[in-house]
Amino acid sequence: MFTFAKPFYPLAFWSLQSNPEQAHQYLIKLLNRIDRFRHSFPEHWILSQIEASFCFQDPRLVQSLWGLRFNNPLGLAAGFDKDGLGAGIWGSFGFGLAELGAVTHHPQPGNPRPRLFRLPLDKAGLNRMGANNQGATILAKTLQETWDRHPRTIPIGINLCKSKITPLEEAASDYVESFRALKDWADYFVVNVSSPNTPGLRDLQATAQLEPILAALHRENALNQPLLLKISPDLDWGDLKDIVNLAKTYELAGIIATNTTISRQGLKTQTLPATGKDIREEAGGISGKPLQQRSTEIIRFIYQQTQGQIPIIGVGGIFTLEDAWEKITAGASLLQVYTGWIYEGPWMVRNILQGLVAKLEQQGLSHLSQAVGIMDN
């Protein structure tokens, strides 16, 4: 079956010489077409080959969280599919969940280009996209059309971000409007106050600013849908502890750790080839390997602070089985990937899932849930 994967890789997962954003847009449009015409030829055949090549199932990886069934713990992180154009196809790539967005109440074009870069020396990405998206209303329409064609096969989350034009003091109503437009079309929702690419957004992580947002969403959430919070890796331990306490107060379903980092410490890349500027002068968040250790440290801290009572989705620097296992044993029940998937290719998901089953057998564990947080037990 992997004979199909070889030609698909250079088509869908671009070479290091290509324009990252242009190639990304091409891929999303291609996947959208395959999903829309999934019952026609050749799209039906292509989809069957994708599923045969990249999917892996084992009952030892199945978990139930928030009343949702996750066939495996490995998900697609927010940022890859901002407008939900591939929402119906991510399960075919073997993912156990997919998070769409970030989406804002108001449509916005994002920051000027170029704004998406790869740092191959560091196995990292640099992005300053600025939450470019078509807005919550359009995303709701897209998802309604997608779910009318076929039911979703994996849990779908939506990452909610503040619109750039909305003043910080009106952030709560902005998040609520997005949630109100989208609440019928996804399985869980994420409050994103940690992107470094929306001016002032990270200020909303402070307790005084975050509490009104969580309170407003809590009031709006009559159906008690899972609400999670995505946090920055650049917070200090005191701020993290405050956020954990707020998560308990407002009964958040979980915490996603972490978003991208503004730190440039330890990077091998000194100059960004696309601009010729010193990497330290370039705005944006770093993803991938440089984020790996810090995100795992934060996962472990949250797990300890909550005694494992608040589920954690771990994201940041996952490329291999060992990367995934480290985050699970630190306390993550679910995982998300983005940069690692770009560098390693679409078979990364299957390889990691097969490896997790082998790890469970080696450790004498009968189910993945038994591995969550065992580094601290």
Curated annotation (Swiss-Prot):
User: What InterPro entries would the database entry show?
Assistant: Aldolase_TIM (IPR013785), DHO_dehydrogenase (IPR050074), Dihydroorotate_DH_2 (IPR005719), Dihydroorotate_DH_cat (IPR005720), Dihydroorotate_DH_CS (IPR001295)
Tell me the compartments it is located in. Answer: Cell membrane
Give a yes or no for keyword Zinc-finger in this entry.
Answer: no
* Cofactor remark from the record: Binds 1 FMN per subunit.
The organism's place on the tree of life at top rank: Bacteria
Q: Which UniProt keywords apply?
A: Cell membrane, Flavoprotein, FMN, Membrane, Oxidoreductase, Pyrimidine biosynthesis
Q: Does the keyword Cell membrane apply?
A: yes
Q: How does it sit in the membrane?
A: Peripheral membrane protein
Cite the binding residues for substrate. K82, N127, R128, M129, G130, N192, N197, N259, T260
Q: Which residues cross the membrane?
A: none
Name a GO molecular-function annotation: dihydroorotate dehydrogenase (quinone) activity
- Catalytic residues identified in the record: S195 (nucleophile)
Q: Which Pfam families match?
A: DHO_dh (PF01180)
Q: Where does FMN bind?
A: A78, G79, F80, D81, K82, A102, N159, N192, K230, T258, G288, G317, Y338, T339
The UniProt entry's GO CC annotations, sorted and at most eight, read: cytoplasm; plasma membrane
Known EC number: 1.3.5.2
A single GO BP term for this record reads: 'de novo' pyrimidine nucleobase biosynthetic process
Q: How does it assemble?
A: Monomer.
Which family is this protein grouped under?
Answer: Belongs to the dihydroorotate dehydrogenase family. Type 2 subfamily.
What is the official name of this protein in its record?
Dihydroorotate dehydrogenase (quinone)
Which species is this UniProt entry from?
A: Gloeothece citriformis (strain PCC 7424) (Cyanothece sp. (strain PCC 7424))
